[in-house]
Amino acid sequence: MKFINNIVPIVTVDGPSGSGKGVLSKQLAYILGWNLLDSGIIYRILACEALDNNIDMCNEDSLQVLMSKIKVSFINIKNSFVVYCNDKEIKKNIHTEFVGNLASKIALFPKVRDVLLKYQRTFCVFPGLVADGRDMGTIVFPNAIVKIFLNAAVKVRAQRRLDQLQKVNFSVNFKCLSSQIKERDDRDCNRQLAPLVPAVDAFVLDSTHLSKNEVENKALLFIQKKIGIINY
């Protein structure tokens, strides 16, 4: 793959909770040999750090200061991306719906988003970047060479989240989980600052009736059309 003007190539993968964007982004980063940015994990880490430090979740200034002290990295170790915060591996579970809802609420604060916007853009380094989030293609990297928006029916997304949480021994009620996902969708899609919407030039992919491999193959085909041959 050849790129002009020394511009770092970026693939953005946006979508709601449970759409499969995290799995797809990690696989694309591995196949392409590029760096990974999972913006949702950064928000979740910020929420957990705020809880651990007894910081008021409604205190925007305190959250902004806390975020400025956090350094997150995604390291590919044996074909699996491991998350580090301030050079320490994140071992506690940050993928619960409780933490996810806190992260979604934190994302409403303009000052926090401003700090995160600048920080997320520091991940844009060669050989390339796969950025996973909700506003990667619209706000953070609007000039990305490839933009993908992944979605799925709420029931399917809720079941995926249920399966994911049960694997790490979390007991969750399906109806409650579905309700939480709908609530989060509403908050993410209707917020005034960086709402969850597909970029106008995004490849919109509905994964409701697709397997992980089918989603991956469709995404790779789209990337090939945009940037050239990929060996995988």
Swiss-Prot record:
Belongs to the cytidylate kinase family. Type 1 subfamily. The keyword Ribonucleoprotein does not apply. Signal peptide: none annotated. It is found in: Cytoplasm. Keywords: ATP-binding, Cytoplasm, Kinase, Nucleotide-binding, Transferase. Pfam families: Cytidylate_kin (PF02224). ATP binds at residues 15-23. It catalyses: CMP + ATP = CDP + ADP; dCMP + ATP = dCDP + ADP. GO terms for molecular function: ATP binding; CMP kinase activity; dCMP kinase activity. Disulfide bonds: none annotated. InterPro entries: Cytidylate_kin, Cytidylate_kinase_dom, P-loop_NTPase. Its main location: cytoplasm. It comes from the Bacteria. GO terms for biological process: nucleobase-containing small molecule interconversion; pyrimidine nucleotide metabolic process. This is Cytidylate kinase. The lineage of its organism: Bacteria, Pseudomonadati, Pseudomonadota, Gammaproteobacteria, Enterobacterales. Its EC number is 2.7.4.25. GO terms for cellular component: cytosol.
